[in-house]
C-alpha cells in the first residue's frame, strides 16, 4: 500500500468525507485517490484560507473535513486558523506538504518551509511529521483521533522523504 492510500484509508476510518485542498503535485497523490472514491467530496480551493473556511462550514453541518495545502500556503491561512478554527474549537486535520526541506530546488520555499512548525508551536497547534511509511498508519490514525477528541485543529506535516518531493 502506498503512503497516499494509507492516508486515504485513515480519513475514511475517521469518517472524514470532505477534502478541501489547494492543488499541488505532491498532494495530488492523495487527491487522485480521493477523487475516484464516491465516499469523498473533493473541493478544490483557490486559497488555503478558503479551504479552511470550507472545512469549518462542513463541521458546522455535522460533516468531518480535512484540508491539504503546501507550507507556503499555510502562511496565507494563519488568520483563518487563529481567528476561526482555534477559538471556535473546530477540529480540522491540516495536511501540510512541507517545502523548503530535503532536496528543495526553489529558494523561495525555504523560509516558510522552515517556519511552519515553529508557527504551529506558537499557535499551540499539535503537529506531527510524516517523513516515512514506517508507522505511518499509526501516526495518522493517532493524530486524527486526537484532533477530534480535543476539538482543535491539528497539523500533519508531510516531508519530501515521505512523498518524494518536487523536481521542478
Predicted regions and their residues:
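Thiamine diphosphate
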Residues: 1-168
